[in-house]
A protein has these predicted regions:
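Loop/turn elements at helix/coil->beta-strand transitions in domains of secreted/extracellular proteins
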Residues: 45-49, 80-85, 115-118, 125-129
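Non-catalytic, surface beta->alpha helical segment in thiol-disulfide oxidoreductase systems
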Residues: 107-148
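Bacterial N-terminal signal peptides
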Residues: 1-5
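N-terminal leader/targeting and pre-domain segments
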Residues: 13-45
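Structural alpha/beta surface segment adjacent to cysteine/selenocysteine redox centers
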Residues: 87-115
Length: 148
């Protein structure tokens, strides 16, 4: 049993994805991370706020960005329906959350249970977390989960 567990952990380690550098899309909203203000700004323009939680050099973040946020019809749909901001799960920038508490990016990720990247939170207008998507999803599945 121990040999089988060791063999499976070695096999899993052999297929671990390699780090992959990426840039966040230039159309993502530049913000002071005042989430209540960002939610209100989006709502005023008939959009929702989408928060993209990422990790530097995360290959699955790179894939999700490339397939959905960088080019093509998915980007156009997302950009027309959402203001998108990015939060680094290991970042130290201050984030004013919807309850008025200021967290670092990494503290907020922990508070919200973001245990894998990429993760996407869709904010409702009240403001509240309306929807949470954890991990990489293929483009069609991702768009379905966003309701697009």
């Amino acid at each position: 049993v121990i040999c089988a567990a060791f063999a499976s952990s070695v096999a899993a380690r052999d297929i671990e994805p390699k780090p992959l550098h990426y840039e966040l899309p230039s159309w993502f909203k530049q913000t002071f991370l005042e989430i209540p203000v960002d939610v209100q700004d989006a709502h005023t323009r008939g959009k929702k706020l989408l928060i993209f939680f990422h990790l530097d050099d995360c290959p699955y973040c790179a894939y999700l960005l490339q397939e959905n946020f960088t080019e093509g019809p998915n980007r156009e749909k997302i950009e027309s329906k959402f203001d998108v901001i990015a939060i680094n799960v290991r970042g130290d920038l201050p984030v004013n959350w919807i309850d008025g508490t200021v967290y670092s990016e990494k503290q907020l990720a922990r508070k919200l249970g973001v245990f894998a990247t990429p993760a996407v939170l869709v904010m409702g207008p009240k403001p509240e977390v309306a929807h949470k998507i954890m991990g990489y999803k293929k483009p069609g599945v991702f768009m379905d989960l966003l309701g697009l």
